[in-house]
Curated annotation (Swiss-Prot):
This is NADH-quinone oxidoreductase subunit I. Its cofactor is [4Fe-4S] cluster. The lineage of its organism: Bacteria, Pseudomonadati, Pseudomonadota, Gammaproteobacteria, Candidatus Pseudothioglobaceae. The keyword rRNA-binding does not apply. Residues 54-84, 94-123 form the 4Fe-4S ferredoxin-type domain. It comes from Vesicomyosocius okutanii subsp. Calyptogena okutanii (strain HA).
Length: 163
């Protein structure tokens, strides 16, 4: 009987409504944690794995030696490499494609590369106009690498103490 009376009093006084309004009022005056994304950026870890890039040596030559270790270690089979022997006896890639829809951004390709040719940059805001746009060709990868070489070197330097 007393439980029913307590329940009736709580329902009559709208106790749950007051509790909810109290929580709402408290959150109204608290500091906002939302970031207005395109205008504001949050800090990114130096170990963040984003868009891929192929690097070049300072003399302009591609670093990739077509060893295909990155292709072999990729758990998602997102990397496709075709290579050809050059006149000087070295092997170079003729095709280096990464399907970003398949890629799980695990970083195994970067770890497997013996010459630091493939890296994952800190670029995370990119879009594709079509399904074909998700395939990063060798030319696009080299372009990303050339445009971001200074940032890549800086993040490699910051990350070196953890390896």
């Amino acid at each position: 009987m007393i439980k029913k009376l307590n329940k009736l009093i709580k329902n009559f006084t709208l106790n749950e409504l007051r509790t909810g309004l109290k929580v709402t009022a408290k959150e109204l005056v608290n500091k906002k944690i939302t970031v207005q994304f395109p205008e504001e950026r949050t800090p990114i870890s130096p170990r963040f794995r984003g868009l891929h890039a192929l690097r070049r040596y300072p003399n302009g030559e591609e670093r990739c030696i077509a060893c295909k270790l990155c292709e072999a270690v990729c758990p998602a089979n997102a990397i496709t490499i075709e290579s050809k022997m050059r006149d000087d006896g070295t092997r170079r890639t003729t095709q280096y494609d990464i399907d970003l829809f398949k890629c799980i951004f695990c970083g195994f390709c970067e770890e497997a590369c013996p010459v630091d040719a493939i890296v994952e940059t800190q670029i995370f805001d990119y879009v594709f106009e079509s399904r074909q746009g998700s395939i990063m060709t060798k030319e696009r990868l080299l372009e990303v690498g050339s445009q971001n070489e200074q940032v890549i070197n800086q993040t490699k330097f910051e990350d070196a103490k953890y390896k």
